[in-house]
Each structure stands twice: as structure tokens, then as C-alpha cells.
């Protein structure tokens, strides 16, 4: 699947087209019905939590079903208690992701 790059304003229809997904595929990934997604694409105001889920799932390509509280806690702990280890792991993770 392609990665959609966007500016600060997230236009869901543009992202969906860049990813080559239909409305059902695109919106169901973040728990929105096809008809609800269609309304957002037509200009209805999108709540901030929906916009953030859209960004995480489709722009950042994060599988939000796999995010666990423990994982978030580990990252927060490393960032605050051992920032050098966090930076080193972040660098290694980026290299690993590029090699896949």
C-alpha cells in the first residue's frame, strides 16, 4: 500500500484516492461507516478524534488495532528517563523500517 503524504490540512478524499481505496475500505479501518465517510468527504465537519485516527491509520500507516497501552508507556518512559536510549532506538527503528 502506498503512503499518502499530506500537509497540515487532511483531505480524506485525496488521501483515499492516493491510497487507491474505496470508501468502505478506507473508512472502516478507523471505525467509520461508508456513509459517514462520504459525508466527511463532502465537507461535513470531521471531529478532531476522527481526523487524528485518519492521520494515524492512513498518513502515518500505523495499524491502530495493534497499539497497546504498555507500548505507549515504554516509549514515554524511555523519552523521559533515558532520552539517549530512546534516540538510539528511534534511529535503529527507522533504519529497520526502511530495510523492510
Residue ranges and their predicted role:
Residues 1-18:
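A short, Lys/Arg-rich alpha-helix, primarily the initiator
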Amino acid at each position: 500500500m502506498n503512503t499518502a503524504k499530506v500537509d497540515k490540512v487532511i483531505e480524506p478524499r485525496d488521501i483515499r484516492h492516493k491510497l487507491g481505496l474505496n470508501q468502505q475500505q478506507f473508512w472502516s479501518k478507523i471505525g467509520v461507516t461508508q456513509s459517514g465517510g462520504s459525508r466527511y468527504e463532502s465537507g461535513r465537519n470531521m471531529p478532531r478524534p476522527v481526523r487524528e485516527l485518519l492521520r494515524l491509520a492512513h498518513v502515518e500507516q500505523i495499524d491502530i488495532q495493534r497499539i497497546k497501552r504498555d507500548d505507549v508507556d515504554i516509549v514515554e518512559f524511555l523519552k523521559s528517563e533515558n532520552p539517549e536510549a530512546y534516540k538510539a532506538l528511534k534511529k535503529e527503528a527507522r533504519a529497520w523500517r526502511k530495510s523492510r
